[in-house]
From Swiss-Prot:
One annotated GO biological process: D-amino acid catabolic process
Keyword field: Hydrolase, Metal-binding, Zinc
Metal-binding keyword on record: yes
Taxonomic source organism: Cenarchaeum symbiosum (strain A)
EC number: 3.1.1.96
Subunit details: Monomer.
Chemical reaction(s) catalysed: a D-aminoacyl-tRNA + H2O = a tRNA + a D-alpha-amino acid + H(+); glycyl-tRNA(Ala) + H2O = tRNA(Ala) + glycine + H(+)
Cofactor, how bound (note): Binds 2 Zn(2+) ions per subunit.
A Pfam family matched in the record: tRNA_deacylase
Gene Ontology MF term list: D-aminoacyl-tRNA deacylase activity; zinc ion binding
Name recorded for this polypeptide: D-aminoacyl-tRNA deacylase
Cofactor: Zn(2+)
Protein task: D-aminoacyl-tRNA deacylase with broad substrate specificity. By recycling D-aminoacyl-tRNA to D-amino acids and free tRNA molecules, this enzyme counteracts the toxicity associated with the formation of D-aminoacyl-tRNA entities in vivo.
Family label: Belongs to the DtdA deacylase family.
Amino acid sequence: MDLLVAHGGDPAGSNMARYLAEGMEPDGKIWHGRHFDLVIIDSPAISADWIGGEYEYDGYVFLSRHGAESGKLALTCHSTGNFAEAQFGGSDREVAIPYPGFQRRYMRRLSERREKFNGFDITIEATHHGPTGLDKPSIFVEVGTTEKQWNDKGLCGAVAELVRETAEEQDEKTPFVICVGGTHYPEKFTDVLLKGEYALGTVVPKRALVNLDDKMFSHILERNAGAAAVLVDEGGLGPEKRRILNMLEGSGLEVISA
């Protein structure tokens, strides 16, 4: 069973959580359901490395707002981790265990209902921010991109309903890949997730490749145990391309071009 987590100070997360809490059984700080439980926490979700020690579940789904300087409307879903210094939660040079099956089921459901979300980009993001220390899979589901959307109870409720449906659906155990290259909003990897045969694990963007050395990649492999391959956006590797490809080819995993 998964635990859905929202920060009480996050308007989008709180609105999604309140929608989901209807019909669930309150028990102290926890709401119990048939297929998942829910908790609203007092501290930011990006700093919730502690939550696995207090609430033991099979996986953790964080309900959150999404922000961007561009203000472009987006509904996003991403794994967490820091490839260098931890500036927004988690630990330095640590990535979380991703939740590929949940992300794939949620994003495909979101894409199928995209007519309900006119004007919104439906996209994954590269792996970023915390928490990073949980010993079970985790994923962020986010509503963006301004206070207007975060406080839109109808929008947040519609997204939360898709989260509910996803949590109630059995994981089909789709093979997943580690992704390397591309931008923060990697279109090629999103297309693979929505239309291809793979789910996605950790996504390392081009801007982080300068920090991707053998030690960091070994850690990523450990946190993505069972990955079927490494999916590479070769056009999105920048000046690190040859070094990165040589390192990936020595990993023992198949390297596939996106």
